[in-house]
Amino acid sequence: MKVSRPRPPKRTHVVDYSIPILPRQVDSPVFVIASVRSGSTLLRMLLNSHSRIRAPHELHLRTIGVQLTPDFSEQSMQELGMDKVELEHVLWDRILELELERSGKEIIVDKTPGNVFVWERLHYAWPKAKFLFLLRHPEGVVSSLQNRKGNTSTREALETNALKYFKPMEEARRTLDGLTLRYEELTAEPERITRDVCAYLGVAWEPEMLDYSKHDQGRFVPNLGDRSDTIKSGRIQPARTFDNTDALSPELAEYAKAWGYS
């Protein structure tokens, strides 16, 4: 019988940065800052279809850590100018580098939703990182959560889940330099939006990006991205649109307003 493992908590990481960062092998990775059910899998497949951009499945870097033995490895690493936090950054950096080497591409993108909880750490670890903020109407996010296969959560619980992502995502969007996108616009005008993304990343736009089914996107694996029939269709399909925010809680309605949906 398969053993169910607890998922990492959905909260912002508080990290003590006491040691300067080391040089990175990947100088300017790209991180998508987005909630669950926001269309980030479609975005990553479009980007991964570019000849110079590697956008793999969700990497979940924040849950990849190291353990140092007190008085031995801890002291040894400190003599080399590294603590646990910086060692983890070195490991994450190497993972990105290996994936770039394997793909033969130049730019790597990670779209893990959990990035919203470590955006400060990602910015600290990679001062030259680039950020894509992907928004979706809050009702679209909640409705998508409701429609998931096997969903048993109440509407209230799903809204609470969405808020856990929205709060740090909006904080990151207001703090960091980056490019803000809307899922609804990505599906309605994919060429225009992907052109904007390519311009931000400093690469020429390629029409092949829009036909993502013709490129190797990897396997559809649980917990590593969307596996719905919509994404598997290989076609960009219009997102659901919502005329108002009447069904949302007051707190979610505030995000809809802040993001230009009302």
Which residues are covered by each model-predicted region?
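Glycine-rich phosphate-binding P-loop
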Residues: I33-L47
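PAPS-dependent sulfation machinery
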Residues: I21-S28, M45-R121, A125, T230-A258
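PAPS-dependent sulfotransferase catalytic domain
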Residues: L61, Q67-P70, R102-E208, R219-G234
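Short, solvent-exposed loop/helix junctions and linker helices
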Residues: V26, R37, T187-A188
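Short, well-ordered beta-strand elements within core beta-sheets of diverse protein domains
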Residues: F31-A34, E184-L186
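PAPS-dependent sulfotransferases, especially Golgi type II membrane carbohydrate sulfotransferases
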Residues: M1-V30, E170, A199-S262
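Short hydrophobic "helix-edge" motifs at membrane interfaces and signal-peptide entry regions
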Residues: S28-V30, S40, P127-K128
